[in-house]
C-alpha cells in the first residue's frame, strides 16, 4: 500500500509541474538541450526517433528486434538499420511494439537482406524529428510525428529502381523465433495504388490489437508479396515506384486501437496534407511548450542532461484514445473518454 501511495504522490507532483501551467509566448528553444541519442547504447533502451509528448506514435529506426538488447528497437553501436517502425517503448527494459516496419531501398527487389549501413556522422535527432542516410541504397530518410500519425519522407538519390518494403509481420520480440508467432491474427486490404489498410492482433508482453491506414503521396507502379514463413499471419509487401534521382516519396501512417476508421480520422484531423515541414515544426513546438515549463540554470552539459531526462520522462505514458475519444479497454471493450485521454504504458 505504501508503495502504491508513493507512486501516486510522484505522479501527482509530475502532473502539477507539467499539466497545471499553460505557458505562452515561449521564446527560448529548449529543444536544443535535448539529445535523443542519450541512452541508445549499452542497454539504455531509448530510441532516437520522432514523437510528441505522451503520443501514441514513436516512429524510429530499428537495428534489431529479436533480443533484450533491442527493447527499443535500436542500438547506436550497430552499423546497419533494417527499417523504421511506428511505435516503441522507451527505457522500459522489456520488448514489445515495433509495429509496421517500413524500409525504402533501391536496386534489386530480390535483396534478401533488406537492411543498410548508415552514415552515423550524418544522423540527426531532436524532439519531433529524425533523419539518417541509408548509405547502401543512397536514400535519405526523415521522420516526424503527430499524436496518432507518423510521417516519413524518403529521398532517393541513386538512378536505380525505387522500392519500399512494408513489413506487417515484424515486431520487437524477446527472441527471433517469436517473429513468426507474435502476430496471432491479421487482415490487410489494398484500397488503391496509394493506400493500405488493415489490422493486427499481436501478443508479446501483452496481447494488443491495432488498426492502421498507410498512405503514399505517389502511386506505386508494382507490388509483390514476400513468401511467408511457417506460422506467420501478416504480409510483407514490396512496392515499386517510378522516380527520378533526387525525387522523394512521402508516407503517412495512422494508428488506432479501435478501428480502421479511427486511424483514417487521425490522418484527416492531425495530418491532412503532405506538408512534412509543417508537421515537423508543430511537433517541435509541442515539445518546446512542455519543456519550457521548467527553466533551470547551469552549464550546457547540465542543461542537456536535465532536459533530455524530462524529454524521456514525457514520452510515456501514451494517450491511446482516437480523435473522437474512443479507445480499446480491458476485455476487448470499446470505451469512451469525455476528455479525449486514456493513458497506457504506465511504466516508469
Task: Map each language-model feature to its residues.
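Accessory carbohydrate-recognition regions in carbohydrate-active enzymes
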Residues: 26-348
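Bacterial Sec-dependent signal peptides at the C-terminal "C-region" and cleavage site
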Residues: 18-28
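Bacterial N-terminal signal peptides
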Residues: 9-18
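Bacterial N-terminal signal peptides that target proteins for export
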Residues: 1-10
